[in-house]
Swiss-Prot record:
Modified sites of kind Phosphoserine: 81, 89
Taxon lineage: Viruses, Monodnaviria, Shotokuvirae, Cossaviricota, Papovaviricetes
Native organism: Human papillomavirus 25
Purpose of the protein: ATP-dependent DNA 3'-5' helicase required for initiation of viral DNA replication. It forms a complex with the viral E2 protein. The E1-E2 complex binds to the replication origin which contains binding sites for both proteins. During the initial step, a dimer of E1 interacts with a dimer of protein E2 leading to a complex that binds the viral origin of replication with high specificity. Then, a second dimer of E1 displaces the E2 dimer in an ATP-dependent manner to form the E1 tetramer.
Every SF3 helicase domain range: 406-556
Protein name per the record: Replication protein E1
């Protein structure tokens, strides 16, 4: 009998028949399938609710921070080892000014969950103890580097690098840096000489600096011992600390923290001997001659062998020879001689400088006044015109007088009587409208003959005529009516050329004659009846024309000292001024005036 359709009878597969699904035509119904699908166990697989964006930027920022932290930890592990400072400089690590407590902190962050943390990754602020060899108190030999630890990295990280540099300087040179220098607190204070100590400079740069500094300095002193280099430089112009540091950092390629700079001690013999004896060493480079402050304290010369006492007569002789009469000029000019003149140095070191200056000025005025009184007018004019340098044209004066319609022959005759103090011919008046050159003409003559000028504004003082006793020729400028009244009342005898009693300050009234007197005024005294007693005592010349000027606003007639020098030289015989000068030139030789205690044969 055949097997039923859809089944196979085989041994060992009986269970399959039990599990075989039953077929039905109902499975082909699509509506029933969809209805059953809605009742499935995975009906909530898809979320059909509205979607919210959330804070994505905060998440992105958190991820970036984690990446940065990981990179930072890698760099710390690579470059910031706890033993890095000790490996760079054990000696620097051993230096401690105060005890430090050990404080532990976590140097590297952990990447695990935070459990089972140990102290293996904790680093101490203070490095472990390092065995440091004993320091040798003896300076290192010149040019010998040895096993010097040039820990410039530790120097830059030190809190007080100046103290470390000073310690290394004293260790190298055997003398303190402050023993050779004086302190400038300001960086803007200028000085010509500077002491510079530089740490950890390459040898090639030191050699090159020996040549480069020569163009900036008059004197260079360089010495290198170990890692320290010492410079003494005297610049051609004053420099402040900032400029010096800028020059040295550029030239030596170093950091400013590696430099110590202060000006040297100028009045310390021990410091001067350090530089003087050091320049004789084999490892020292020097350029130029010794500065004055080193030479004066270490080198014995004729100036230092002289006595250091002040000699007032030497100061008076100097002021007399150089025509210094004012106290301010004497003090300033004599102080400028101090570096080369031992007497000026002694004067500066004295406590009574002002007293000596006043006494010197008084003595010079006494000598000059006595010299003037001894000279005649011819000698005086001859002396003063020969002090004028250069040559001029005497025709300028003649042309100006002709321009003002002045008879030159009459003017020459009046000038001759004026210079020889002829009675009642001892005063010349130049009158006319303003701006005609009266003051310019007379002032130029007073200037070349070293005369004095009177001012009537001081007439309330009884000493206003005192300058008449100290000159050979005087000028009273711009005489007005009150001045004419005063002259008509009190000065008739003086204009006559007779002796008068002249009251001088701090002195008894003295007997003297008026010197040659020049007057300028806008009033023609000869036309004034009220002053008829002055007509015979004053010779007048009128200046009617305005003073001519060029297009560039300069005088057309240049009335200079050289013009008057040429005028007197040309008209010397016409003015009858030749006798005294002929005796001076062709007679016996004249000895220069000497007012000091130095003998004439003494060596200069």
């Amino acid at each position: 009998m055949a097997d039923p359709k859809g089944s196979t009878s085989k041994e060992g597969f009986n269970d399959w028949c039990i599990l075989e699904a039953e077929c039905s035509d109902i499975d082909n119904d699509l509506e029933q399938l969809f209805d059953q699908d809605t009742d499935s166990d995975i009906s909530d697989l898809l979320d059909e609710n509205d979607v919210e964006q959330g804070n994505s930027r905060e998440l992105f920022h958190l991820q970036e921070c984690q990446e940065s932290e990981e990179q930072l930890q890698k760099l710390k592990r690579k470059y910031l080892s706890p033993k890095a400072v000790a490996q760079l400089s054990p000696r620097f690590e051993s230096i401690s000014l105060s005890p430090q407590q050990k404080s532990k902190r976590r140097l590297f962050a952990e990447q695990d969950s935070g459990l089972e943390l140990t102290l293996t990754n904790e680093a101490e602020d203070v490095s472990p103890e390092v065995e440091v060899p004993a320091l040798n108190s003896q300076p290192v030999a010149e040019g010998q580097s040895g096993d010097i630890d040039i820990s410039y990295t530790a120097l830059l990280r030190a809190s007080n690098n100046k103290a470390i540099l000073m310690a290394k300087f004293k260790e190298a040179f055997g003398v303190g840096f402050n023993d050779l220098t004086r302190q400038f607190k300001s960086y803007k204070t200028c000085c010509n000489a500077w002491v510079i100590s530089v740490y950890a400079v390459h040898d090639d740069l030191i050699e090159s600096s020996k040549q480069l500094l020569q163009q900036h300095c008059d004197y260079v002193w360089i010495r290198g011992i170990g890692a320290m280099s010492l410079f003494l430089v005297c610049f051609k112009a004053g420099k402040n600390r900032g400029t010096v540091h800028k020059l040295m950092t550029t030239m030596l390629n170093v950091h400013e923290k590696q430099i110590l700079s202060e000006p040297p001690k100028l009045r310390n013999v021990a410091a001067a001997l350090f530089w003087y004896k050091g320049s004789m060493g084999s490892g020292v480079f020097t350029y130029g001659s010794y500065p004055d402050w080193i030479a004066h304290q270490t080198i014995l010369g004729h100036q230092s062998a002289e006595a250091s006492t002040f000699d007032l007569s030497d100061m008076v002789q100097w002021a007399f020879d150089n025509n210094y009469l004012d106290e301010a000029d004497i003090a300033y000019q004599y102080a400028k001689l101090a570096p080369d003149n031992s007497n000026a140095v002694a004067w500066l070191a004295h406590n009574n400088q002002a007293k000596f200056v006043r006494e010197c000025a008084s003595m010079v005025r006494f000598y000059k006044k006595g010299q003037m009184k001894e000279m005649s007018m011819s000698e005086w004019i001859y002396t003063k015109i020969h002090e004028v340098e250069g040559e001029g044209q005497w025709s300028t004066i003649v042309q100006f007088l002709r321009y003002q319609q002045v008879n030159f022959i009459m003017f020459l005759a009046a000038l001759k009587d004026l210079l020889h103090s002829v009675p009642k011919r001892n005063c010349i008046l130049f009158y006319g409208p303003p701006n005609t050159g009266k003051s310019a003409f007379t002032m130029s003559l007073i200037k070349v003959l070293k005369g004095r000028v009177l001012s009537f504004c001081n007439s309330k003082s009884q000493f206003w005529l005192q300058p008449l006793s100290e000159c050979k020729i005087a000028l009273l400028d711009d005489v007005t009516d009150p001045c004419w009244v005063y002259m008509d009342t009190y000065l008739r005898n003086g204009l006559d050329g007779h002796y008068v009693s002249l009251d001088c300050k701090h002195k008894a009234p003295m007997q003297t004659k008026f010197p040659a007197l020049l007057l300028t005024s806008n009033i023609n005294v000869h036309n004034e009846v009220n002053y008829r007693y002055l007509h015979s005592r004053i010779k007048g010349f009128e200046f009617p024309n305005p003073f001519p000027m060029k297009a560039d606003n300069t005088p057309q007639f240049d009335l200079t000292d050289q013009s008057w020098k040429s005028f007197f030289t040309r008209l010397w015989h016409q003015l009858d001024l030749s006798d005294q000068e002929d005796e001076g030139e062709n007679g016996e030789s004249q000895r220069a005036f000497q007012c000091s205690t130095r003998s004439a044969n003494e060596h200069l």
